């Protein structure tokens, strides 16, 4: 687990400030350098006309506490900024008269559009937060760091549990004939690099120096290449991650008990 010595003094000062003041107080003009970078880098008019891929971006509706998923034709600069709006750093982003925060609170990422609105069987998840850590955090900042990771992973785990449930319904042929065409056995793939990510603290998310960013890019590409070398042939054929073994535990037991009951009755 990253130590306090790995965190720059500027992070501690900024963290302390955000606990005392809101962005409406310390950043009244809502200055966000990322907004300028996105505006200069992405042609949103061209993006909205794209019909070769489906892009889904989620944001949290502040008033209702519900997730809103924006589709390709709806995406503009405000949508992108809303999806990354951490409320202790930036003012809520207003879209069509409604305020939004970071989508990660309810979907990190939101998976359901990928199997409700696409025909592909393969679902690939690229993790940017470590799922597990070997040590129990002891310092205040280590504890907050781990809480941050668990909070943002919780929505993903809930969706993975739902996917695992449907996969078991299909596997054990528990769907009525009239509903079988409405569900398919999603093939789940998980790209993780916990050995790299566990060395980084929440403070690393505030680092913007070029060397750090390019280093993370290179490590990400190396991780993806390694995954493809090992698993490319599995795409479209079978899962490459054990949902129950890596993320869940109770769902399998429920279905195994169900199968045992049926076996007992049949005998």
Protein language model annotation of sequence segments:
Residues 1-267:
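Patatin-like phospholipase
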């Amino acid at each position: 687990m990253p130590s306090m010595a790995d965190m720059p003094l500027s992070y501690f000062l900024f963290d302390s400030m955000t606990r005392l003041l809101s962005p409406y107080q310390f950043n009244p003009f809502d200055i966000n350098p990322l907004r300028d970078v996105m505006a200069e880098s992405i042609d949103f008019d061209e993006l909205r006309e794209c019909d070769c891929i489906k892009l889904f971006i989620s944001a949290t509706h502040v008033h209702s506490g519900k997730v809103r998923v924006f589709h390709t034709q709806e995406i503009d600069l405000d949508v992108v900024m809303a999806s990354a709006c951490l409320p202790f750093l930036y003012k809520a982003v207003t879209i069509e008269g409604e305020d939004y925060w970071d989508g990660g609170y309810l979907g990190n990422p939101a998976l359901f559009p990928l199997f409700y609105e696409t025909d592909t069987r393969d679902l690939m998840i690229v993790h940017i937060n470590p799922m597990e850590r070997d040590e129990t955090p002891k310092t205040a900042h280590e504890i907050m760091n781990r809480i941050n990771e668990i909070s943002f992973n919780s929505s993903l785990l809930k969706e993975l549990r739902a996917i695992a449930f449907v996969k078991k319904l299909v596997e054990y042929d528990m769907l009525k004939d009239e509903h079988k065409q409405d569900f398919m056995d999603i093939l789940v793939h998980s790209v993780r690099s916990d050995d790299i990510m566990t060395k980084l603290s929440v403070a690393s998310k505030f680092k913007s120096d070029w060397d750090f960013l390019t280093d993370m890019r290179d490590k990400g590409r190396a991780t993806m290449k390694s995954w493809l070398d090992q698993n490319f042939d599995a795409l479209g054929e079978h899962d490459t991650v054990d949902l129950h073994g890596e993320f869940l535990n109770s769902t399998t037991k429920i279905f195994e008990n169900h199968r045992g009951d049926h076996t007992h009755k049949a005998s």
